[in-house]
């Protein structure tokens, strides 16, 4: 799993010119959770599930990975722009993974919401886009 999450992060940091994703979140991409007091906007990614699969002698992994985009902008323009850049970066993409071959990665679903977050400065309205991707890997 570590090889996959490392490759996922590396893909974001090496493809900044094409998608602009990392620039749009100020390079604030975190695995599993953001640090307390993280500046907006930011994105958190995590593996939701990792299911082993096989066909005869080939071994596969069916992974669901979730990206959560957070923006404190008053309107939804910023979070929508970040979402578009995330799709450009990861939907039907290709990248190298040590010990695995990426068969596919595509967007599964999008859930949009507006949350209220309590900060030392008070309550803040935050846009939260939760984007799920299906990933299929072959073990090598």
Enumerate the predicted regions with their spans.
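Short, acidic Gly/Pro/Ser/Thr-rich loop/turn segments
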Residues: 52, 138-140
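Extracellular/virion structural assembly segments
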Residues: 56, 72-93
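Short, solvent-exposed beta-strand/turn "edge" segments of beta-rich domains on protein surfaces
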Residues: 54-60, 120-124
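Acidic-leaning, charged glycine-interspersed low-complexity segments
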Residues: 88-138
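Small/polar-rich, solvent-exposed N-terminal microdomains that initiate assembly or binding
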Residues: 1-57, 93-104
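Short, conserved turn/kink motifs that form compact alpha/beta structural patches or helix kinks used as
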Residues: 44, 60-61, 70-78, 108
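Oligomerization/assembly interface segments of phage tail-like spikes and tubes
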Residues: 59-73, 86, 127-137
């Amino acid at each position: 799993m570590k090889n996959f999450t490392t490759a996922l992060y590396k893909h974001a940091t090496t493809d900044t010119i094409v998608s602009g994703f990392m620039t749009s979140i100020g390079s604030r991409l975190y695995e599993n959770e953001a640090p307390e007091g993280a500046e907006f906007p930011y994105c958190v990614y995590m593996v939701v599930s990792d299911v082993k699969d096989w066909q005869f002698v080939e071994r596969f992994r069916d992974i669901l990975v979730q990206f959560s985009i957070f923006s404190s902008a008053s309107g939804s323009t910023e979070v929508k722009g970040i979402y578009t850049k995330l799709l450009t970066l990861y939907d039907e993409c290709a990248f190298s993974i040590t010990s695995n071959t990426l068969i596919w990665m595509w967007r599964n679903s999008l859930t949009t919401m507006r949350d209220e977050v309590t900060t030392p400065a008070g309550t803040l309205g935050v846009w939260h886009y939760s984007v799920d991707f299906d990933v299929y890997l072959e073990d090598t």
